[in-house]
Amino acid sequence: MATDARGVVAITGATGFLGRHLVRALAQDGWRPRVLVRRDPVHPFWRDLEVEVVTGDLGTPRALDRLAKGAEVFIHVAGLIKARTLEGFNRVNQDGARAAAEAARAAGARFILVSSLAAREPSLSNYAASKRAGEDAVRAADPSALIVRPPAIYGPGDTETLGLFQLAARSPVLPVLSQTSRVAMIHVEDAAAKLVAFCRTPVLGLVELSDVRRDGYTWTEIMRGAAHVMGAKPRLIRLPDPGILTAGALVDAWSSLTNTPSVFGLGKARELLHTDWTPSSAPMAEGVPSKFGLIDGFTHTVDWYRAAGWLPKNIVA
């Protein structure tokens, strides 16, 4: 752990998956995390840390001003991953990003927007369009801001990836999406470490992150990797693109009928079938190298799941 005292880092989205790890990584590097939360209680992941809490949300200007005041860096991690309409996404991913950037600039804090690699292809989905809109809003509010686009993030505490390992262990078959797609991945600890490095060393412009394999992975490699760390050998079955798109459209129809947003839908199906989700920025722009590749990252994650009781320790295929 670093011993040199650093400044205050303001963080939105601190109770989310990446945000929780980021707060810990910043504190361990000597920074003083200040987080925006809707409710006051400190998250269990931070119980042993000194974390300053500001109560409020992205729609509360006074809370954003308190969050940003005196901060050296402002990292905006908060975002919406499911909404029924583009307008619903934009209220958080565009308007919230703009409000955070404006508060940071007024306070004289360097601003870092954690966006998504999906923003590179805004025509694919409402989510992707809203993330690009958020980037554009931040550039307009603060041209000196750094925009960081992580790919798919996984690691300890991730509830989304848990289902992949459960399926890999128990199912005799695993679905494989487009055989031509390449998908970048990053372990959450690597993503947090890179953001901490950007706090130490100012970077401008746009950076796209990855793990040790900047050319990404095929869906076959990802599914085989998940099965491997679970000690399973399921058969891989290629899902046809039209079937995936149809499933997405049906989910959208049900979401509209029930007025219940879903992460998966036609837009997400298009994202999953897109051929290139690998970083285009120079590797040196990431600041620090990644530690984890796919297999050791998956192994580290599964070890955590088992220790936490999220996966049985004796689970077999």
Swiss-Prot record:
Look up the EC number in the record and give it: 1.-.-.-
Main location as per UniProt: periplasm
- What is one cellular component GO term in this UniProt entry? periplasmic space
Short name of one Pfam family: Epimerase
| Deletion phenotype | Deletion mutant cannot form dihydroceramide. Deletion of the gene results in a ceramide molecule with a mass reduction of 2 Da, corresponding to a loss of two hydrogens. Mutants are impaired in growth at elevated temperatures but are resistant towards the antibiotic polymyxin B.
Recorded hits in SMART domains, A to Z, give:
PKS_KR
Keywords, sorted A to Z: Lipid metabolism, Oxidoreductase, Periplasm, Signal
| Enzyme class label | oxidoreductase
Which residues does UniProt call coiled coil?
none
Q: Where in the cell does this protein reside?
A: Periplasm
Leader peptide range in chain numbering: 1-27
Instruction: Report further notes.
Output: The bacterial ceramide synthesis pathway operates in a different order from that in eukaryotes. Furthermore, phylogenetic analyses support the hypothesis that the bacterial and eukaryotic ceramide pathways evolved independently.
As for family, the record states:
Belongs to the NAD(P)-dependent epimerase/dehydratase family.
**Under what name is this protein listed?**
Ceramide reductase
Q: What gene is this protein translated from?
A: cerR
